Design a protein with these regions (language model features):
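N-terminal Lys/Arg-rich, disordered targeting/topogenic segments
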Residues: 1-12
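Alpha-helical, hydrophobic structural elements that either
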Residues: 15-23, 27-233
Length: 233
């Protein structure tokens, strides 16, 4: 009887220790993912340039910072989860847009498979071209035909600057785009992603995310203490 109780106690201790280890491992994985997903400090805050600084000074620091609630991660059949925009701000007084663009390490593996590359590119390589596509409604009095490409014109806007940062699981870029005007006939603004090794703007982008859609509600984008610090510089 004594041996039975001892064996039972040992079994209980073993199960307890095993369960504890499982929870510890799961907790460590979740914590690692959380830390990796957090925007690194070097790209977390607004990136002032001459355009933004001039607008900030001209308006006595009273700038509008806004965004829209749009899908922040690609959900297409061929790019599901590949790319995301984890921060976006429109600053109309400066005619500027800033975004934080992010992709996972697994996206690089998918890239190699999708484009038939001989080997998986190094994480440190610059792999993607990111631009904005601004579409304008040529028939603003009739929005029912906006699904017809012939009723829209488009303008591609290239980044003024790009700052890069990495975590263990992700690669981040803060892109600054100047000359982005949202007017009454602006139909949409999209972040287009192309693989640099096969860059052709006439092709469908590898990934695309809507940043602005005509008629959708604007939301205030609060400034963090870090944003205010760099603006007041």
């Amino acid at each position: 009887m004594k041996g039975y109780r001892t064996a039972r106690a040992v079994g209980w201790i073993f199960r307890f220790v095993f369960t504890l280890l499982v929870f510890a491992v799961v907790g460590l994985v979740i914590w690692r993912i959380f830390l990796s997903a957090k925007i690194p400090k070097s790209v977390r805050y607004l990136q002032p340039n001459e355009v933004l600084s001039a607008a900030y000074e001209a308006n006595d620091g009273n700038l509008t910072f806004r965004r829209q609630e749009q899908t922040s991660i690609t959900r297409g059949e061929k790019n599901n989860g590949y790319f995301s925009v984890v921060d976006c701000v429109f600053i109309p007084e400066a005619e500027q847009v800033q975004i934080v663009f992010r992709y996972n390490n697994s996206t690089i593996r998918h890239l190699a498979a999708d484009y038939g590359l001989e080997k998986i590119p190094e994480k440190s390589e610059t792999l993607f071209d990111v631009t904005l596509l601004r579409t304008t409604d040529l028939t603003p009095d009739d929005t029912s035909d906006n699904g017809d490409p012939s009723t829209l014109s488009s303008e591609r806007i290239y980044p003024t600057s790009a700052n890069r940062a990495e975590s263990s699981l992700y690669t981040f870029y803060r892109f600054v785009f100047d000359g982005v005007r949202i007017e009454d006939d602006t139909d949409g603004v999209f972040a287009d992603v192309y693989y640099l090794g096969a860059l052709d703007y006439s092709d469908v982008p590898y990934g695309a995310l809507c940043l602005y859609a005509s008629g959708d509600k604007w939301l205030s984008r609060p400034l963090s203490a870090g944003d205010k610090k760099v603006l007041e510089g």
